[in-house]
Amino acid sequence: MSETATWQPSASVPNLLKRAAIMTEIRRFFADRGVLEVETPCMSQATVTDIHLFPFETRFVGPGHSQGMNLYLMTSPEYHMKRLLAAGCGPVFQLCRSFRNEEMGRYHNPEFTMLEWYRPHYDMYRLMNEVDDLLQQVLDCQPAESLSYQQAFQRHLEIDPLSADKTQLREAAAKLDVSNIADTEEDRDTLLQLLFTVGVEPHIGKEKPTFIYHFPASQASLAQISTEDHRVAERFEVYYKGIELANGFHELTDAREQQQRFEQDNRKRAARGLPQQPIDNHLLDALKAGMPDCSGVALGVDRLVMLALGAERLADVIAFTVDRA
């Protein structure tokens, strides 16, 4: 394909046909298990507060809103899907577009396809097993292995991420030759993420998918804190062949705790000179009304298809990446 023929799709037609077959297979997987497919908005009046996520923003100027209404493209359908759970929809899944105003590259595109699903009355481990089932079916891979976040750091970096102070984390960073980044970073979780990315990720999920679970409580996001060890959150991620595929939680259902986390995120954003984001009060109201105890997971479909097809980059499995959009 000519480099100058930018009207043409990024992916080949055979790859797009294979992608369509995988989408059908995913829907069949959930239909066979009685999980309802839902559709939720791509835009919202509120957005994520996470300091590491950057949403696209637009304005609605239609009738009744001549002064304009700020809207955000969804980085994930999570908040709307949790409102459906609180309304009594039962187990739900969604295949949808998500948007993040971040990087573009081998594994990233600002517009991407997300598979997200929620299972009432599932704990984190039961959902991990279901994710493993889906990966084996779509990728024809071996059953996954599991490591706690603590075990992964101890195995590959010989450091305990739950007890190490920032000086010890910087010493570990020096051994990985990333002191130029670590020495000026004051946020402990950012240091941990740096070490995980550089020192752990390259060593896991090579032959089979690998689940990393029980992230530090400070990285709980929307997950519950473990009742067995308050230092960790009921959160997991799964990696395969150098790619992060999914991020899952035993979901937080306490509205007050969730609001406190949103507010803490905004304080961190302010400290970093980032804009504070509007908190989703609809989600908080849904939690107050009573969302069932559940676990949920978000999985990057484009990355899944890339692995299934043995492709080298997302552009090989997306019809039009942002540079051709």
From Swiss-Prot:
PANTHER family with a match to the protein in the record: ELONGATION FACTOR P--(R)-BETA-LYSINE LIGASE, LYSYL-TRNA SYNTHETASE
SS bond list: none
Gene name linked to the record: epmA
EC number: 6.3.2.-
Binding site for substrate: S76, P77, E78, Y118, E251
Upper lineage: Bacteria, Pseudomonadati, Pseudomonadota, Gammaproteobacteria, Enterobacterales
Similarity comment: family membership: Belongs to the class-II aminoacyl-tRNA synthetase family. EpmA subfamily.
Chemical reaction(s) catalysed: D-beta-lysine + L-lysyl-[protein] + ATP = N(6)-((3R)-3,6-diaminohexanoyl)-L-lysyl-[protein] + AMP + diphosphate + H(+)
A Gene Ontology BP annotation from the UniProt entry: lysyl-tRNA aminoacylation
Keyword ATP-binding listed: yes
Sequence positions that bind ATP: R100, N101, E102, N109, E244, L245, G300
Pfam families attached to this UniProt entry: tRNA-synt_2
Cited PROSITE patterns: AA_TRNA_LIGASE_II (PS50862)
InterPro entries assigned to the protein according to its UniProt record, in alphabetical order: Aa-tRNA-synt_II, aa-tRNA-synth_II, aa-tRNA-synth_II/BPL/LPL, EpmA, Lys-tRNA-synth_II_C
Cellular-component GO terms for this entry: cytosol
Protein name: Elongation factor P--(R)-beta-lysine ligase
Highest taxon of the lineage: Bacteria
HAMAP family: EF_P_modif_A
